[in-house]
């Protein structure tokens, strides 16, 4: 079972300029990169810029990754990477609220964008019904298929835990390994992007003591875990794969292990280092006075 999973499921989207306890102004607001990616699955320029005005951080880019990718199209993902029109704004004054926000991602939109203008979108459109009839593309049923963490459903993701939507949009479902190699060293706290609510997104590593930058840098752990028992009505066998990429690679009547569905996970406060939104308040290299930040884990 894969042990790399992004569990940043919730974003609190509230904008206010009346108070600004967590200003991100001046951090990554003057960046421009244009570099040709000669990977055989890309062969295009990766172009992105980050600027700002008085209120917002502004991203403009073409969504082309600036690093090596897997082979696309492939048998489980028949889509070709193509340039996108990425124009997004993020408040410079994000507001931390006490209530967990609404789930986002998947068909509802990106939860965050990486520095290179590639979106983070951990959710999928894959669904199963109670009878085990599943689809990887706009399926019906209440059981949400996870992109990572199991081998029953193959979305054709690459070494960056990413794949390509039918629109040609390359996007991350999990740890953007080769982007991290570009941005940081083997074990450092690395800012990889910005969430829809304006807070920064880091990946894998953080300080062992949240408010102590002199503490060791460690792999931060989520507070989500697999449930000990499946939910009532959960299908345990794939009876039919009705459509979407990869339908030819799965045989009916195979088991669906725990971890294949979003509903297989539960949040346990204090289990790991992070909260229900996979974030915490603490100091970072860019924010030595502290800020709320999300983690890709």
Model-derived features with residue positions:
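A mature extracytoplasmic/lumenal domain signature
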Residues: 94, 124-126, 174-176, 205-207
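Solvent-exposed N-terminal domain segments of exported/luminal and surface proteins
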Residues: 17-154
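Short loop/beta submotifs within extracellular cysteine-rich repeat domains
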Residues: 98, 179-182
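Extended, compositionally biased non-globular segments
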Residues: 197-199, 209, 213-297
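Extracellular/lumenal glycan-associated surfaces
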Residues: 115-118, 166-179, 287-297
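Short amphipathic alpha-helical linker/capping segments at the junctions of internal repeats
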Residues: 187-200
């Amino acid at each position: 079972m894969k042990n790399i999973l992004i569990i940043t499921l919730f974003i609190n989207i509230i904008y206010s300029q009346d108070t600004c306890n967590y200003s991100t102004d001046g951090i990554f607001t003057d960046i421009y990169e244009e570099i040709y990616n000669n990977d055989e699955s890309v062969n295009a320029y990766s172009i992105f810029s980050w600027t700002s005005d008085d209120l917002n951080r502004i991203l403009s880019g073409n969504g082309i990754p600036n690093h090596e990718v897997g082979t696309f199209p492939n048998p489980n993902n028949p889509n070709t990477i193509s340039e996108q029109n990425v124009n997004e704004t993020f408040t410079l004054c994000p507001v931390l609220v006490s209530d967990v926000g609404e789930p986002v991602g998947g068909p509802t939109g990106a939860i965050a964008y990486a520095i290179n203008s590639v979106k983070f979108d951990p959710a999928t459109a894959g669904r199963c019904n109670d009878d085990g009839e599943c689809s990887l593309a706009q399926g019906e049923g209440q059981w949400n298929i996870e992109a990572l963490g199991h081998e029953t459903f193959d979305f054709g993701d690459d070494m960056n835990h990413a794949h390509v939507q039918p629109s040609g949009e390359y996007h991350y479902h999990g740890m953007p390994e080769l982007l991290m190699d570009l941005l940081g060293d083997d074990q450092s706290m690395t800012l990889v992007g910005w969430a829809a609510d304006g807070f920064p997104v880091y990946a894998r590593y953080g300080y062992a003591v949240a408010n102590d930058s002199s503490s060791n840098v460690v792999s931060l752990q989520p507070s989500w875990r697999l449930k000990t028992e499946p939910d009532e009505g959960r299908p345990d066998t794939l009876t039919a794969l009705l459509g979407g990429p990869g339908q030819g690679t799965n045989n009916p009547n195979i088991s669906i292990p725990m971890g294949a569905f979003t509903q297989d996970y539960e949040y346990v406060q204090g289990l790991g280092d992070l909260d229900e939104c996979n974030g915490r308040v603490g100091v970072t290299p860019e924010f030595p006075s502290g800020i709320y930040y999300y983690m890709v884990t």
